Amino acid sequence: MSKASYVKFEVPQDLADKVLEAVRKAKESGKIKKGTNETTKAVERGQAKLVVIAEDVQPEEIVAHLPLLCDEKKIPYVYVSSKKALGEACGLQVATASAAILEPGEAKDLVDEIVKRVNEIKGKTSS
């Protein structure tokens, strides 16, 4: 299956697992926003520390604006393979296309590591 058009880089599975763990920890000890509307607002306001986007969103237009907006606002973003897994990490009973970590809480070190690895991955793909 080919990647969606909004997926700008490949995320290794170990990193995707860390992303979901960071979302879980931030939900418990910090602050997150769930869903594309809330995530978009957090990015536009410059509040998001990390944006998480699911790769299996249909139609793609729901989240296609997020990578561009994040780049414009210089907010790091990362992908996870499943909107269902992202929804569960957010504490939801349903899937969610995207989420934003506003305050990482106990996940701060994990978020810092994720941002560093994402920047390394993006550096390789953009050169």
From Swiss-Prot:
Provide the protein's localization: Cytoplasm
Sorted alphabetically, the Gene Ontology BP terms of this entry are: ribosome biogenesis; translation; tRNA 5'-leader removal
Question: What are its GO cellular component terms?
Answer: cytoplasm; ribonucleoprotein complex; ribosome
Primary localisation category: cytoplasm
Source organism superkingdom: Archaea
Query: Is Signal found in the keyword set?
Result: no
Which cysteine pairs are joined by S-S bonds?
Answer: none
Question: Which keywords does this chain's UniProt record carry?
Answer: Cytoplasm, Ribonucleoprotein, Ribosomal protein, RNA-binding, rRNA-binding, tRNA processing
Give the molecular function GO annotations. Answer: ribonuclease P activity; rRNA binding; structural constituent of ribosome
What Pfam families does the database record attribute to this sequence? Ribosomal_L7Ae
Supply the HAMAP family for this chain: Ribosomal_eL8
Which family is annotated?
Belongs to the eukaryotic ribosomal protein eL8 family.
* Function of the molecule: Multifunctional RNA-binding protein that recognizes the K-turn motif in ribosomal RNA, the RNA component of RNase P, box H/ACA, box C/D and box C'/D' sRNAs.
Alphabetical list of PANTHER family matching this protein: RIBOSOMAL PROTEIN L7AE FAMILY MEMBER (PTHR23105)
Assembly notes:
Part of the 50S ribosomal subunit. Probably part of the RNase P complex.
List, alphabetically, the NCBIfam families matched: eL8_ribo
Q: What is this protein called?
A: Large ribosomal subunit protein eL8
